């Protein structure tokens, strides 16, 4: 019976395989095999014995079911694993788990899961960056209303809005690449991090194992990998989830009936918005992913708590981390994928954007007129007061600001009717938006090559 929504509703199959019970088991077998391989490289284990261990260190031979049977008696998962391996290896079983402690296996296997997760997350993020770059380029010069405090501000372009998202995504990619060597790490220095059980060659043994597995080698550990590494990983997941939810929240707001400037694609032939309101076209994918992003961020708190281990370690982190790392990873991937889907199928209504600007009766061009007055020789504060008074008069009378400006002595004396008309064209007050879009797109595309 499926219980967790990840089982039947959210997350991709690849992530579920990484963090599944079988995925964990498979990687722990791989770590145990790598340990014996390293001993073989250092002359402590024969080629023949290693060959036998390598042969049985696969889930089809040392099955998860057999390990579970033994664990029911031992009440210790890694001891059950090593017993099952030794059972299958016969005389070669003597060298299995030699010099290791349980968390050498557990944390190194988790390191493999994190490494594999990062590969998938990076792939999804690069796809999202590509989709967003295309959107920014397409809408580079689409003029729309900028809003601050939920109120009409001054014109921007939709391309600039998207470029802001795009550059943030690029920073997230940089953060991931910078942090991966600190996250994809194992450890193999035994019960308290001294390497005493491995002897004088302990550090070389650890180096051989971890480089063989494709993981980074830490300098100093206790019985476990430092949980600051997991904090950094889950913090990155949470950060990316924030980026995605911010985008999706904007889509949801722009799709409001009274704004209607952009929104999710909708299959009018098959899709249903409401069981009773037949006209509805709801931004359900954005809402869905926004909810999942909040769950991702919620895993920050237990991840921080899991770093507070006693002395060289305790076990209070173990049960919690079975949830935090797996669920945060899978859900973040889902959020990124859904955000890419929303932006791929996003509709943008440029005419509606211009209509919404026009609905403000020219008020959003007050800044433009003020700046032109300053350029004409009137002080900034005086220019501001002139436009403030004109704006409030226009609001009070329900007039167009351009009409009030035309009869305001200081403005009428400074500009002709044609010059004033040009000032009230929103496209003439978008600054260097196009340049910013172009550079953001170029940098983003270079980052994902």
Each PLM stretch: what is its role?
Residues 288, 295-380, 386:
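Long, amphipathic alpha-helical stalk/connector segments used for oligomerization, subunit docking
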Residues 1-189, 195, 203-208, 217, ...:
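A helix-coil-helix interface module used to build multimeric assemblies
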Residues 226-263, 270-329:
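A conserved active-site cap/scaffold subdomain adjacent to cofactor or substrate pockets
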Residues 39, 160, 231-239, 277, ...:
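Short, well-ordered beta-strand elements within core beta-sheets of diverse protein domains
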Residues 366-414:
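C-terminal hydrophobic structural anchor segments
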Residues 137-159, 261-280, 311-320, 344-364:
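Glycine-rich cofactor-pocket loops
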Residues 124, 150, 154-164, 168, ...:
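Short, contiguous, pocket-lining structural segments
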Residues 102, 199, 216-224, 354, ...:
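A structural signal for small-residue-enriched, beta-sheet-centric alpha/beta enzyme cores
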């Amino acid at each position: 019976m499926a219980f967790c929504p990840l089982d039947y509703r959210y997350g991709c199959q690849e992530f579920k395989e990484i963090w599944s019970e079988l995925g964990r088991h498979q990687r722990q077998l791989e770590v145990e095999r790598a340990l014996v391989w390293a001993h073989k490289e250092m002359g402590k284990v024969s080629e023949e014995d290693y060959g036998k261990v390598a042969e049985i260190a696969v889930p089809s031979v040392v099955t998860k079911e057999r390990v579970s049977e033994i664990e029911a008696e031992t009440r210790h998962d890694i001891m059950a694993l090593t017993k099952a391996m030794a059972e299958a290896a016969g005389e070669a079983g003597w060298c299995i788990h030699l010099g290791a402690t349980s968390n050498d296996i557990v944390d190194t296997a988790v390191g493999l899961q994190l490494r594999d997760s990062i590969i998938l997350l990076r792939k999804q993020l690069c796809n999202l960056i590509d989709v967003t770059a295309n959107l920014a380029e397409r809408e580079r010069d689409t003029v729309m209303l900028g809003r601050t405090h939920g109120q009409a501000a001054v014109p921007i372009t939709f391309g600039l809005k998207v470029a802001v998202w795009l550059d943030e995504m690029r920073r997230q990619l940089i953060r991931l690449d910078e942090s991966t060597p600190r996250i994809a790490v194992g450890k193999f220095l035994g019960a308290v991090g001294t390497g005493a059980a491995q002897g004088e060659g302990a550090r070389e043994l650890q180096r051989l194992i971890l480089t063989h597995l494709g993981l980074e080698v830490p300098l100093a550990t206790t019985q476990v990998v430092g949980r600051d590494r997991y904090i950094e990983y889950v913090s990155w997941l949470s950060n990316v989830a924030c980026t995605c939810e911010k985008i999706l929240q904007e889509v949801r707001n722009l799709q409001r009936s009274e704004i209607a400037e952009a929104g999710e694609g909708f299959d009018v032939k098959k899709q249903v918005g409401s069981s009773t309101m037949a006209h509805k076209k709801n931004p359900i994918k954005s809402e869905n992913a926004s909810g999942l992003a909040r769950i991702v961020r919620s895993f920050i708190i237990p991840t921080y708590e899991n770093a507070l281990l006693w002395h060289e370690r305790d076990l209070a982190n173990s049960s919690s981390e079975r949830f935090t790392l797996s669920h945060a990873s899978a859900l973040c991937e889902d959020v990124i994928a859904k955000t890419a889907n929303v932006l791929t199928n996003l509709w943008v209504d440029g005419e509606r954007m211009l209509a919404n600007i026009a609905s403000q009766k020219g008020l959003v061009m007050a800044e433009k007129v003020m700046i032109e007055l300053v350029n004409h020789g009137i002080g900034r504060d005086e220019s501001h007061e002139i436009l403030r008074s004109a704006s409030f008069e226009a609001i009070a009378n329900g007039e167009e600001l351009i009409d009030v400006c035309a009869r305001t002595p200081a403005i009428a004396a400074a500009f002709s009717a044609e010059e004033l008309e040009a000032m009230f064209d929103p496209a003439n007050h978008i600054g260097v938006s196009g340049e910013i879009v172009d550079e953001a797109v170029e940098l983003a595309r270079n980052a994902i090559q």
